[in-house]
Amino acid sequence: MKKKLLAVLLATGLAATTLLGGSILVSAADDGGNTAQARTLDEIKKDGKIKIGVFSDKNPFGYVDENGEVQGYDVYFGKRLAKDLLGSEDDVEFTYVEAASRVEYLQSAKVDVILANFTVTDERAEKVDFALPYMKVALGVVSPDDALITDVKDLEGKKLIVVKGTTAETYFTENYPDIELVKFDEYQEAYDALLDGRGDAFSTDNTEVLAWAQQNKSFSVGIESLGDIDTIAPAVQKGNTDLLNAINDEIKSLADEQFFHKDFEETLKPVYGDNINPEDLVVEGGVVDSEDSAAEDAEEADTTDADAASDDTENAEVTEALEETAAAE
């Protein structure tokens, strides 16, 4: 597991902090879901630090590098957000979160913002307020080359690794309840389980498994796109309107300089190379490409047409059977 910047005293529930290049990095203990009032934008400005929840083990989006520094696509954006709201990239306190704790960290006001590859869903939107999106994803499935999973049907009788609290867990639980899921709290734990054979495949955002497979040559992404095209967005505590509006304004204004394309070039292209087109991932100004929506609509239309054709065939077969019965009588 990647080196942590700080030690968490689990027995006492305390968190240790360390200063690094002006930014504060924190790993906080779970307090069991207590709620607290979020800080307003004015309070954040008065304090001089914005608290942002990020992943520490989801390379290349939020991770700790070999020098002990937090890096990634989400982190790059977090630093820019701090600069534009407070005056400096150093005016940010990064707190490490797990997938299943993202909502709780907002509800308990441990962080002001979550920038941890947070997929927008209706269920989550009931608990937090999402800002405009800055990325789009689908699910992917990575597995060993010598037993490559290329279709969901290949998972029958197999063990699929997922991380708790992710859209992958929800998707397979709701759509493929017969597939055995092996669940972990952290991404690094999930990848370790895949490497040592405790599961046959791992599903999470396709952007991540594609990056991981690039660095682990005996593994490949046999299913590159599964489920809907979803969006990734910042989130704040429910009702923290001033901060939400400020983030939305920031995302809109950054479109003028194509900021998230620069973010891609800086943090993702070194991992993906030319294997991923930034247009398939990047969202500028909070506006999702209309082609994605059109593709989803077309897919739904195809499904509807197929269902209708199936119904017509069944009706024709029933009619033919009735006619044969009448003739026999």
Model regions and ranges:
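Sec-dependent signal peptide cleavage junction
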Residues: T18-A36
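Extended ligand-binding regions for polar small-molecule ligands
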Residues: A29-T35, Y76, R80-D84, T166, ...
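Extracytoplasmic small-molecule ligand-binding "clamshell" domains
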Residues: D31-L115
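Short loop->beta-strand "edge-of-pocket" segments that line small-molecule binding or catalytic clefts
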Residues: K49-V54, Q71, V152-T166
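Periplasmic-binding protein-like
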Residues: S56, M135-S143, N206, L210-K252, ...
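Acidic, polar ligand-binding/catalytic clefts
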Residues: K79, D91-D154, S220
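Short helix-initiation/N-cap motifs at beta->coil->alpha
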Residues: V92-E104, A147, V182-D192, D196, ...
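A ligand-binding cleft/hinge motif common to bilobed small-molecule-binding domains
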Residues: S101, F118-E126, Y171-E174, Q188, ...
